[in-house]
A protein has these predicted regions:
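Short hydrophobic alpha-helices and adjacent helix-cap/hinge residues
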Residues: 1-104
């Protein structure tokens, strides 16, 4: 799930997915707080800083068409072990070791 429009629906989506035993992977850790199995995506604060840099460049005269497309340089992993247990999924230790956040 990657659409920002779904953010406010993260709890009902997570509840419904768990009810139907459907593992979900989202783009922000708030989804794992709500019950999604995992989230993996760039840190939002870093994205906000990049956006602010682009806005500053545009406001100081840069043409938007001349600005390069930038890709995230890092990503954060969050996993929800409660959801994993409810779904009968074992998260490998190597994945848990890589996670920035693990919900017990």
């Amino acid at each position: 799930m990657s659409d920002a429009a779904l953010y406010d629906l993260r709890e009902p989506i997570s509840v419904l997915a768990l009810k139907h035993r459907f593992p979900t992977i989202a783009y922000v850790p708030e989804f794992t707080d709500a019950g999604a199995l995992m989230s993996y995506g760039p840190p939002r604060l870093a994205m906000y800083h990049r956006t602010a840099e682009y806005v500053k460049k545009i406001l100081t005269g840069a043409k938007p068409a001349d600005l390069p497309v930038q890709q995230p340089t890092q990503a954060e992993l969050s996993t929800n072990l409660r959801t994993a247990r409810a779904l009968g999924i074992t998260i490998p230790d190597a994945v848990l070791a890589r996670a920035e956040r693990v919900i017990e």
